[in-house]
Amino acid sequence: MPHSKHRDYTADKQDIPYTELKACKSPWKHRTPAVKQSPVVLSEEQLKYAELTFHRTPQLQPRKQTVRRKRQGPKSAVWRVVTCVLGVLCVVLMITMGILVPKLFSGQEEQYRETSLHHLLKNDSSCDPCSHDWIAFGNNFYLFFRGTKSWAESKSACEELNSHLLDIDSKAELENLLLFEINGWILVKKNQTNWSSSENETKLQHTLIDEKKNHSCRYLRGSQFIADDCSSKKPYACEFNKM
């Protein structure tokens, strides 16, 4: 029995430090809630991060604008190329119009002159030089055409106007016609002249140039009478002698 009591006593002694240890550990359990300050620290860090992001956000906007400008760059270059091409086309069209329009109007004017004279001759057998662009020197009237025809076609066209192909029969008439720089068929042929005086006839023969075998028709170029093929196309002038 004494031995058992001794064991119980020792057991009680061992229980005492265990309870003391529990009692000593208990204050740490009460101090553990102090560790809960970490969320406060995190919230301060979050505030700093928010402030940093708030200061950085305005700097991102220019980058977006530069990206937009870079994206718009190729489109503006394409539009520049298109405008340059359109400008070149407009210049080319203006040049072509400036060249073609005068030719068109001159051709229409000549056709109108021929048709008006043709209708006039149908209505009246006599030619009225005052109603058209005839040029008068004394009793002679001249009408010049820019359209090209052969010698025979020019002669028949003048006959339809109740006139004849240009016939230079005097030196004074030639000097008057030199003022207009005429370049076209005349009525005289090879070995044929209407000049009355022998002096004028020799002058006509000396002014003939480029004479060939098949060139039996004459045309006037400035003050020169040139022999050429009758089938070649040249301008012509009609003459009307008013009595």
UniProtKB/Swiss-Prot annotation:
CDD domains: CLECT_NK_receptors_like. It holds the Pfam family Lectin_C. The chain crosses the membrane at residues 81-101. Residues 102-243 are extracellular. One of its GO terms (biological process) is positive regulation of natural killer cell mediated cytotoxicity. A motif (ITIM motif 2) lies at residues 47-52. It is a single-pass type II membrane protein. Residues 137-239 form the C-type lectin domain. Its main location: membrane. Glycans are attached at N123, N191, N194, N200, N214. It is found in: Cell membrane. A motif (ITIM motif 1) lies at residues 16-21. Disulfide bonds join C158-C238, C217-C230. GO terms for molecular function: carbohydrate binding; transmembrane signaling receptor activity. Expressed in natural killer (NK) cells. Heterodimer with KLRE1. Interacts with PTPN6. Contains 2 copies of a cytoplasmic motif that is referred to as the immunoreceptor tyrosine-based inhibitor motif (ITIM). The phosphorylated ITIM motif can bind the SH2 domain of several SH2-containing phosphatases leading to down-regulation of cell activation. Lectin-like receptor for natural killer (NK) cells. Heterodimer formation with KLRE1 mediates inhibition of NK cell cytolytic activity. This is Killer cell lectin-like receptor subfamily I member 1.
